[in-house]
């Protein structure tokens, strides 16, 4: 196994990162379409598009929770498996894969039950109003049934990428995304199912992707193979995976809490149109974040493998290249958003009033987008080298310590309450990047020094 993956420790980083990152970025871009295509179609439903879009936006906290729980296990399990491979311990790597799958199945069943039992209560908690609850409930009632497919697809695909099979991981996303894009207009418009059709198209697409992932990991081309005997015996290796994945879980789950805070505050100060605009803003933010995460995921096998192999020079070079690429991307996208906000907003809505409102809000909300590259590079490198505590602290600082309080503090400081709520995002991002950069500089140097001493 070590021989199979030795290219991670020998090929030039500048050639290796594009080789792994480009397919992952493409997969993330397609995954972005996967996540937002429902919103694009729903926002253009005649007569009810704006309210239906707002209803889907209210569902986002629950959808984010589902994604976060897949990361809870897999985002720690995949780097752990890479580290085991770097050490030549293939058996432990495969047990990690099996144990993580079992954990994901258990979690998905619990999540499905909770969402079906307390569906309406959760949707009202996350910002639904009497005008939007019916659309939100129709979508969530169907989407919840596909939770297990989402969990397994997102979770196991991380293990495919961690082995260096970036193109296979890309195909996983493309298969589901293309199918979803094709089925959405059929179910929403042709069959007249509306938001229910969007949810049904999504879970069918995820089920097909799930079947693809499992078939690959049970096949002959994979290095890490999914085996029945590891499903239970591998559970003993999952606690370190969960500890390492906790920061990514916090980062993603906190998006759910933050979405709830934004929705309820905006509903209070600006009504349904402000919540609908937030659905659009969060979609554009996904556009910014997913490719950054794709590059970081492409760098993860390189960093983790070389960290496990004790090659500090390649770990350092991997981070520097990751940081450069992420910064260039985030600055370029920030410029486009500032110059052409109506183009981004117009993808999700046809209502003139909503487009005008959301375009103004987008410039405020994405004001600090140009520094996202620093945050993502540092946080994901912490995960890649197994620094679980540092990655948790960074995630908690940005989301819980800064952003959530600012959502409620900013409206007390500014006369324009709605704009103040949106402004909480760039203020929190700026402060978080300063904190993260300082913490990373100190701890990354220590990690490299320890590697050199060994």
Role assignments for model-derived ranges:
Residues 1-24, 81-148, 190-245, 303-368, ...:
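Short alpha-helical transmembrane segments in multi-pass integral membrane proteins
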Residues 22, 38, 77, 118-119, ...:
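Hydrophobic/aromatic residues in alpha-helical transmembrane segments
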Residues 25-79, 143-150, 239-306, 326-334, ...:
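Transmembrane helix-bundle signature of multi-pass secondary active exporters and lipid flippases
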Residues 33-36, 44, 50, 84-87, ...:
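Helix-loop interface residues and adjacent transmembrane-helix termini in multi-pass membrane transporters
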Residues 53-113, 150-169, 277-335, 339-341, ...:
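Small-residue-rich hydrophobic transmembrane alpha-helices
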Residues 71-74, 143-161, 172-177, 198-211, ...:
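Short runs within selected transmembrane alpha-helices of multi-pass transporters and secretion channels
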Residues 402-411:
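Transmembrane alpha-helical segments of integral membrane proteins
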């Amino acid at each position: 196994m070590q021989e199979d993956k030795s290219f991670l420790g020998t090929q030039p980083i500048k050639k290796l990162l594009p080789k792994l990152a480009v397919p992952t970025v493409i997969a993330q871009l397609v995954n972005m379409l996967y996540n937002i295509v429902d919103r694009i179609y729903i926002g253009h439903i005649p007569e009810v598009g704006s309210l239906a879009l707002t209803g889907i936006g209210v569902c986002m906290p629950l959808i984010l929770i589902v994604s976060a729980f897949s990361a809870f296990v897999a985002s720690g399990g995949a780097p752990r498996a890479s580290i085991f491979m770097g050490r030549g311990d293939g058996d432990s790597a495969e047990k990690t894969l099996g144990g993580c799958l079992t954990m994901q199945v258990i979690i998905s069943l619990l999540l499905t039950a909770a969402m079906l039992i307390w569906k309406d209560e959760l949707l009202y908690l996350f910002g639904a109003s009497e005008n939007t609850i019916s659309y939100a409930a129709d979508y969530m009632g169907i989407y919840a049934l596909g939770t297990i497919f989402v969990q397994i697809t997102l979770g196991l695909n991380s293990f495919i990428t961690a082995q260096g099979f970036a193109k296979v991981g890309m195909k996983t996303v493309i298969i589901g995304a293309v199918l979803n894009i094709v089925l959405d207009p059929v179910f929403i418009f042709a069959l007249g199912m509306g938001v229910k059709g969007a949810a049904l198209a999504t879970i069918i697409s995820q089920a097909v992707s799930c079947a693809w992932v499992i078939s690959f990991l049970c096949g002959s081309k994979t290095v890490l193979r999914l085996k029945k005997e590891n499903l239970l015996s591998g559970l003993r290796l999952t606690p370190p995976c969960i500890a390492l994945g906790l920061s990514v879980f916090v980062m993603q789950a906190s998006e759910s809490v933050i979405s709830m805070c934004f929705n309820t505050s905006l509903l209070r100060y600006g009504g349904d149109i402000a919540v609908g605009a937030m659905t659009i803003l969060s979609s554009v933010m996904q556009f910014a974040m997913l490719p950054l995460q794709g590059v970081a995921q492409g760098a993860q096998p390189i960093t983790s493998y070389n960290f496990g192999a004790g090659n500090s020079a390649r770990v350092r070079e991997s981070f520097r290249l990751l940081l450069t690429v992420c910064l260039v991307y985030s600055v370029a996208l920030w410029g486009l958003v500032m110059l052409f906000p109506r183009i981004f907003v117009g993808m999700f809505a046809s209502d003139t009033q909503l487009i005008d409102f959301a375009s103004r809000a987008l410039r405020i909300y994405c004001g600090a987008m140009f520094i996202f590259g620093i945050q993502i590079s540092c946080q994901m490198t912490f995960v890649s080298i197994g620094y679980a505590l540092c990655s948790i602290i960074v995630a908690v600082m940005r989301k819980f310590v800064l952003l959530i309080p600012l959502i409620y503090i900013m409206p007390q400081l500014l006369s324009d309450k709605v704009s103040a709520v949106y402004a909480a995002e760039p203020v929190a991002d700026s402060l978080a990047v300063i904190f993260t950069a300082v913490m990373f500089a100190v701890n990354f140097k220590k990690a490299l020094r320890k590697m050199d001493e060994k």
